[in-house]
Amino acid sequence: MLRGEIWQVDLDPARGSAANMRRPAVIVSNDRANAAAIRLDRGVVPVVPVTSNTEKVPIPGVVAGSERWPGRRFEGAGPAGWIRRCATSPLPS
């Protein structure tokens, strides 16, 4: 798990109009913190959910990424204001 990678994460439960469900998100924490969270098998990492509908993403503070997903290429963006925390244990390896 490295900074800038796109992972599929479960964002439920969400409040209000926040992004929810299982969706792609960009890892935004530094690599040392990610490695420690995985090694200790506990902790959370900050992520920014991304959407392929980039016209809805308000500027400034956009986090964008592109990653190879099975069968298709994903490109999307999400404003840094959408930052969420995800536990490392349920993230797929």
Swiss-Prot record:
* Coiled-coil stretches noted in the UniProt entry, renumbered to this chain: none
EC class (word): hydrolase
Q: What processes does the entry annotate via GO biological process terms?
A: mRNA catabolic process; rRNA catabolic process
Any single Pfam family the record assigns to this protein: PemK_toxin
Q: What UniProt keywords are attached to this protein's entry?
A: Endonuclease, Hydrolase, Nuclease, Toxin-antitoxin system
Q: Which GO terms describe its molecular function?
A: DNA binding; RNA endonuclease activity
Q: Does the keyword Hydrolase apply?
A: yes
- Its Enzyme Commission number(s) read 3.1.-.-
Matching entries from PANTHER family are given as: ENDORIBONUCLEASE MAZF-RELATED (PTHR33988), ENDORIBONUCLEASE MAZF7-RELATED (PTHR33988:SF1)
The entry's function note states:
Toxic component of a type II toxin-antitoxin (TA) system, its cognate antitoxin is MazE1. Probably an endoribonuclease.
Question: Into which family does the record put it?
Answer: Belongs to the PemK/MazF family.
Assembly with partners or alone: Forms a complex with cognate antitoxin MazE1.
Question: What is the official name of this protein in its record?
Answer: Probable endoribonuclease MazF1
Q: Which organism is it from?
A: Mycobacterium tuberculosis (strain ATCC 25618 / H37Rv)
Q: Which gene encodes it?
A: mazF1
